[in-house]
Regions:
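Activation/maturation switch segments at domain boundaries
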Residues: 1-172
Length: 172
């Protein structure tokens, strides 16, 4: 059905055990035959789904997806429009910190970044997780501002910022 399916969407599991790669790639869309197709790693639970032509977007209105409730451990439904990081922002601070670590959680929750922009900073161009130190060295003012808002100045005080060399990956 190449007339209505031209892209595919990465769909990650919404729970505590999802890998950093899958967290960051959740809800990204790619042209058919391109992008990091799941499974990405051993025991990967992510999947891919067809992304219909924009003319069919009305079919996704009101759609839901499964997520594991952090308190009960039971599966439930959440809005299909939520990405992994949108969903994670709705969880309690201790849960977010257990998933991301204290500093990365602060960047997500206090840095003023959208979930989409936060996701784009998590992986390098080979789709490998990036350290906070490496992210902080990127030559982007909004990144430095986010680190300051999150109280993570110690990452910015380290030498090694290379102007223009480090750019966040563009996820579509």
């Amino acid at each position: 059905n190449s007339d209505i399916v031209k892209k595919w969407r990465f769909v990650a599991t919404l729970d505590l055990k999802t890998s950093r790669q899958c967290q960051a790639l959740d809800k990204t869309t790619w042209p058919l035959g391109q992008g990091p197709l799941p499974p990405l790693h051993y025991r990967c639970r992510s999947t891919s789904v067809a992304k219909l032509d924009d003319a069919f977007d009305m079919l996704e209105e009101g759609a839901e997806r499964m997520a594991r409730d952090p308190e009960t451990g039971k599966s439930g439904l959440v809005d299909n429009k939520l990405s992994y990081y949108d969903w994670l922002k709705r969880q309690d601070l201790p849960y977010v910190q257990s998933v991301l670590g204290k500093d990365r959680a602060a960047l997500l929750l206090k840095g003023g970044l959208s979930a989409e922009r936060f996701a784009a900073l998590q992986l390098d161009r080979q789709f490998q997780p990036m350290s906070l130190a490496k992210i902080a060295k990127m030559d982007e003012k909004y990144i430095h501002s986010a680190f300051r808002k999150a109280g993570l100045n110690r990452y910015l005080d380290k030498p090694g910022l290379v102007t223009g060399a480090n750019k966040p990956i563009e996820l579509s």
